[in-house]
């Protein structure tokens, strides 16, 4: 089972991933928690470069760096974990590239789709939770949590983050079976309950397939 968490800045993805992982482990599932960028040694180096506020990276170079991280991450972490029978929970995946580099940066969506297909080998998540939050509220929340020191992406204009939000909305409309919008403006527990409920339904409906 492969579950990804998506959303804009400050939406609470990491918190919700941790809570779902804890819940699954209590139900006797083996869980691998990971993230993009940064799920491998190479990914951690790329993450530092991509998020460093001092980095000057062109949109196309940024896109290719994220694809590099994803290809390495799939080969070294995600696919081996899935093959071993673990549930993989990932903080950001290919949808973020569409939203940030496609809608946010304005790069060609067809190019991004082809690049994602190469990096992932066609692998898609079983479920994706889009933690839906007003971009301005998310930025305020995020900056309050990191000492008002934004990284390179957080420092982008509000208009950029609004375009990213539109990108996630477009993806949710395109893939309603996979992408589940979740109200991230609720309390942490209320948001977690929405996610647990959706995963519970998915597990009940797909138990036989997951056991193969």
UniProtKB/Swiss-Prot annotation:
MF terms from GO for this chain are: ATP binding; dTMP kinase activity
Q: Per the record, what are the reactions this protein catalyses?
A: dTMP + ATP = dTDP + ADP
Q: Name one Pfam family in it.
A: Thymidylate_kin
Query: What Enzyme Commission number(s) appear in the record?
Result: 2.7.4.9
Binding of ATP occurs at 7-14
Top EC class for this record? transferase
Highest taxon listed in the record's lineage? Bacteria
Q: Name one GO cellular component term.
A: cytosol
InterPro entries in alphabetical order: P-loop_NTPase, Thymidylate_kin-like_dom, Thymidylate_kin_CS, Thymidylate_kinase
Q: Give coiled-coil spans as residue ranges.
A: none
Q: What does this protein do?
A: Phosphorylation of dTMP to form dTDP in both de novo and salvage pathways of dTTP synthesis.
PANTHER family this protein is in?
A: THYMIDYLATE KINASE (PTHR10344), UMP-CMP KINASE 2, MITOCHONDRIAL (PTHR10344:SF4)
Matching HAMAP family? Thymidylate_kinase (MF_00165)
Give the record's family classification: Belongs to the thymidylate kinase family.
According to UniProt, the name of this protein is Thymidylate kinase
